[in-house]
Design a protein with these regions (language model features):
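Glycine-rich flexible loops
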Residues: 1-197
Length: 197
């Protein structure tokens, strides 16, 4: 059984009203594309996988909520804003109608570490994962998803590989997991679609 979709950080969740849908249209469009491809979804154990985010301002970002992979379509009740995080304390603060995705700390570090990144997509696809393992920047196999170690692994990949240029990474210890990022959702999404070629 593959573990996925389980929150491993301390979340200070400030429940609040949803963001206006007008702020989420492009995010939702790309999330729907990833869902249609089966790259965001739910596994046989009914645990959701995959997530998507956009930078809001500074290091704040809007991300799909926890356990939303099982939903075919999302609305503004399914997104939340991460407003701060502390890697050392394995914690973050999210404001919105839903808990932040289990991979939020990883997104946070990428946004902080590369100011040109404005969108991140985390998908699951076994064939692409296997094909691109060690062809693209790849996390160490012993690193678990959703942990401070995974977030720190992003820093290692930025420092020691050509991740900043490739903008796609494979999560060796998170079966099927691939992350792409870009200046916008179109770039992040198209980098994933290009892997199909």
């Amino acid at each position: 059984m593959k573990e996925t979709g389980v929150i491993k950080f301390n979340c200070n969740w400030i429940k609040s009203e949803a963001l206006p849908m007008s702020e989420l249209n492009e995010l939702n469009t790309w999330r729907n594309k990833m869902y249609a491809l089966g790259w965001i979804g739910v596994n046989a154990e009914e645990i959701g996988f995959g997530n998507i985010s956009i930078r809001s301002k500074n290091n704040e970002f809007i991300i799909s909520g926890s356990a939303t992979g099982k939903l075919k379509t999302l609305n503004n009740e399914h997104y939340t804003k991460v407003v701060e995080y502390d890697l050392e304390k394995n914690s973050l603060t999210a404001v919105g109608p839903i808990l932040a995705s289990s991979e939020s700390l990883t997104h946070a570090v990428i946004y902080e570490y590369d100011k040109t990144v404005n969108a991140i997509i985390h998908i699951h696809n076994y064939d692409l994962w296997k094909k691109n393992m060690n062809e693209m920047p790849t996390t160490k196999k012993e690193i678990e998803y959703g942990t401070p170690a995974m977030a720190n692994e992003m820093i290692r990949l930025f420092d020691e590989t050509d991740l900043r240029n490739k903008k796609v990474l494979v999560m060796a210890g998170h079966e099927e997991g691939i992350i792409s990022f870009g200046e916008n959702l179109e770039e992040a999404g198209n980098l994933l679609l290009k892997l199909l070629q």
